[in-house]
Amino acid sequence: EVNGNKCTVPKLKDVINVCKGKIKLNIEIKTGNNDSEDFVSDVVKIIENTDFVDKCVVTSLDYRALRKVKECNPKIKTGYIMAVAMGDFYDLPCVDFFSMETTFVNGRVVERAHKLNKEIHVWTVNDSDSLKKCVDLEVDNIITDNVAGAKSAIATHGDDVFSIVLNQLK
């Protein structure tokens, strides 16, 4: 219930159908103790049945879920959400990219990931200093709560790299 109104949670296939042809989706799988054994494969089937394999990424804090996604369909791009970026995490075979908070990103992290053909996706980049840092480090994806602010910061800077990011935000 929201503001006194009864609401229903939309089904994934309905969300995909609304987004089709407009935006790509980051589908986060949050696992729990009560999940069925087929939970992850059911998500993959929905992605496949809606012809959305190349229009989404699937992310999770649970590496086992990402491994299951790749077992079901290796073409689906997967991202490991990291609460902290410590240790030797770079060579996880079922991960195409790492999603991490902006404070954990530095040149060494980006360089090591890129050497293994892994991307770095950074969240939550809501100010121009963080945006500039991410662009300078050549991260692969920026996640923000403030798209208008990010566009403004990029437009103000005027750099070629910033212009490339701006085009991705459009």
Model feature map: region roles:
Residues 4-5, 79-170:
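C-terminal active-site rim and adjoining tail of enzyme catalytic domains
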Residues 1-77, 94-95, 100, 114-116, ...:
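Metal-dependent phosphodiesterase/phospholipase catalytic core, i.e.
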